Each structure stands twice: as C-alpha cells, then as structure tokens.
C-alpha cells in the first residue's frame, strides 16, 4: 500500500515525509477495520480508500488559507484527518453529530498521536464559534446555501468556506445568498479517480 500511495502522491505533486505517509496508511487501516462494525464509509477496499478518501482530501491542502479550520459533518474524518496529517502546523476541529463517528476519531487521534485535531460531537448550528475559524471545510455535507446558512457563525471576518464538490455546482453557485461571494472555483486533479472534483471557495465576510 505504501508503494501505491507514493505513486499517487507523485502524480498529484504532493511531497510528504515517510512519517506522514505511514500515518495516512495507518488511518486507512483503522478505517477499514472499524468500518466492518461501524459502517463509516461505503468504500470497503483499502486501496480504493487511498484514492477516494486520502487523495481526494489532501489535494485541497494547497488552497487552505490560515491556521484554524473546522471540518463540519466530518463523518469518519474526511477530509479533516488527511488534511491534519498533511498540514501538521494547522489545527483542525472535526465536528460530527454521531457518537460512533466521534469515538472512531478519538481512537485515530490516540493511535496516530495527532495533536492538531479536536474531535467534537455536536450539531453544527449549536457549536460555538469562539474563537472564530480561518476556514470552514465540508465534503459532501450540504448545498452551498445550506452550508453558509448553518455555518455562518463559524468563520472569522476574513474567513472562508471551502466546499468540496463533484461536478461543477453551477446551479448552487447561481442560487447562493447575495451576501456571500464565490472567491474561486478550483478544478481539482485527483490521480486515478474517475469523475470531476471541484473546490468552491466562498468569502465569509459580507460584501
């Protein structure tokens, strides 16, 4: 699995240390193990997880601005866990409302010794925003309008929303509330992954 990950990272142009690679593989192995009992993801094959979960998450890392992030509706830690491994200098709050997912995240935190994550069980609209975050991240969480509506209190004045999407969400962008502005839409290149991937970056401060 290490060889496959190294090749994928090379194709993606993402240089990582051996320690970071081993952490990512350990996370995949834990996800595969816990998935049998906890049903954390529909992806069953660890090699497929490397592409659809690991690479699909970390290709976003170069576009994140700031040091404090919150991953809303993180599920089993996607994209928050892979991003925290790639960006060890940043801090990631991993938010999910289901206890079994948060228990898994805490076990990952313990076994991988990840000091820059904080798993939290809470609904996003009930989670306090002090201090505010530099970025609010979501992957397959909600429409753009629902994301900014439910998470409007989380980013700081210069914070941003980072929405990971599949196909270009033109309809969602057209319907976005007027007080929010799409700063950029990045077409992401994920090696060995069929289908399109886009990152929508939305300014949190009102126009």
UniProtKB/Swiss-Prot annotation:
Enzyme Commission number(s) of this protein: 2.1.1.170
Q: Which family does it belong to?
A: Belongs to the methyltransferase superfamily. RNA methyltransferase RsmG family.
* Pfam families reported in the protein's UniProt record: GidB
Localization terms from the record? Cytoplasm
Q: What is this protein called?
A: Ribosomal RNA small subunit methyltransferase G
Annotated S-adenosyl-L-methionine binding sites? 73, 78, 124-125, 139
Q: Which HAMAP family match?
A: 16SrRNA_methyltr_G (MF_00074)
User: Would you say which domain of life the source belongs to?
Assistant: Bacteria
- One Gene Ontology molecular-function label: rRNA (guanine-N7-)-methyltransferase activity
CDD domains with a match to the protein in the record: AdoMet_MTases
List the GO cellular component terms.
cytosol
Q: What does this protein do?
A: Specifically methylates the N7 position of guanine in position 527 of 16S rRNA.
Broadest EC class? transferase
Which reaction does this enzyme catalyse, per its entry? guanosine(527) in 16S rRNA + S-adenosyl-L-methionine = N(7)-methylguanosine(527) in 16S rRNA + S-adenosyl-L-homocysteine
Keywords in alphabetical order, please.
Answer: Cytoplasm, Methyltransferase, rRNA processing, S-adenosyl-L-methionine, Transferase
